[in-house]
Amino acid sequence: MGFLYLFKLDSDLKALLYGKMMFIETAVKNIALESILVNANSESIQDMYDKVVSGYNNAPTSATTEQKRKLQQNKLNLQNSIQSSLAYAYKKNNPKITHFYNNIGYSDVPVWALFEIMTMGDLGYLLSCLTYDVRDDISKRLSLNVSCDTDRQLIYKYIYTLKDLRNAIAHNAVVFDTRFRNIDPTSAMKQCLKLEIGLPYVNFKTIGDYIILMCYYMKLLKVSKTEIKAFIREFEKITDNYRQAVNPNVAAIVIHPDLASRMNILKNFL
């Protein structure tokens, strides 16, 4: 019987997280897109590469030759992956993309149309390739706490973190035990949430930390306190239902013992 309760816990979690994750993905995309269009002063993908993506020629003055080469390689990899995404979308007859290639009035796909076909992983990689100034601009538009993020890496590191969970939800993989986790959180990723929310520690080893990161993003994205609190209550209800249905020793393995206290800290932060 225990397996059935676990299956229900996992399905209920995915159902709860899906809509909120899609909202976060779309909202962050819109903020990043707006910043890129303003900073490149253009909607051309080529202008984006030239003006807001880091490469050998616009690397920081302090960069070594090796660092400049790495930035250039990342830029080429980005161009490669964007071309592949466009080619795939065209092959699949995606109207968001074919419209621009099959229409004499257009010479290329605009940046905003590219954003419509980007996955969360693509978004994370693009953010990681942007110049420091543009990453700084996006971080500030989002109101991320940059005091513990001198290199402005949080905007893409957190997207990569959420992307692992998002893909697990989309592919109906198991989420309750965070086996989808592909990242090793940096000290800035931990420090930012500890400082902002007042948590004793953060490690992304339990689903609670992902709930915390999603709530932090919802707050940054101006979601109402009422809506975020309702989301937390629903999460608590799902975990409580599981806890009541199984043997306490089993529940203690699946549900982290300090989950309740962490959720209270989170609610006080809101």
Mark where each language-model region is:
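Long, contiguous internal "core" modules enriched in hydrophobic/ aromatic residues
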Residues: 1-270
